[in-house]
């Protein structure tokens, strides 16, 4: 192979999953065993968050955090929090494409693992399985972008002027 072909291959965008792992998981059952005697249907609250950090040049860790809280009336039946992580090798990707890759593609890869781990620990704890629904990470990413833009615009407009000792603002 010629040097020119090697250079062209070295410049090609590269994406590889190095490792997928369960970074952390906790289960709390503060009202067991009495909660097992309750006959009322539980309410379920699910929260999902995504975070990413650069470990070294071209190597990123993405973490999808899922929290499931189930209550019967005002009593917590259980609370599960899991951090499903992955290490991704991402090189030669344009800067404007890196953030969507970390915020959409990587979480989409990790989420099925998170769902499985949460479902497993819930059933092993003695509760009925809760199957987390699919998530559109692109829509979630776009919502976060919109919220960040609105917050930035609000900060620009709301912080102009001088803040007086009584908390009011003097505009100039």
UniProtKB/Swiss-Prot annotation:
Its main location: cytoplasm. GO terms for cellular component: cytoplasm. This is Protein-export protein SecB. Residues 152-172 are annotated as: Disordered. It comes from Cupriavidus taiwanensis (strain DSM 17343 / BCRC 17206 / CCUG 44338 / CIP 107171 / LMG 19424 / R1) (Ralstonia taiwanensis (strain LMG 19424)). Pfam families: SecB. GO terms for biological process: protein folding; protein tetramerization; protein transport. Belongs to the SecB family. It comes from the Bacteria. InterPro entries: SecB, SecB-like_sf. GO terms for molecular function: unfolded protein binding. The keyword S-adenosyl-L-methionine does not apply. It is found in: Cytoplasm. Homotetramer, a dimer of dimers. One homotetramer interacts with 1 SecA dimer. One of the proteins required for the normal export of preproteins out of the cell cytoplasm. It is a molecular chaperone that binds to a subset of precursor proteins, maintaining them in a translocation-competent state. It also specifically binds to its receptor SecA. Keywords: Chaperone, Cytoplasm, Protein transport, Translocation, Transport. The keyword Metal-binding does not apply.
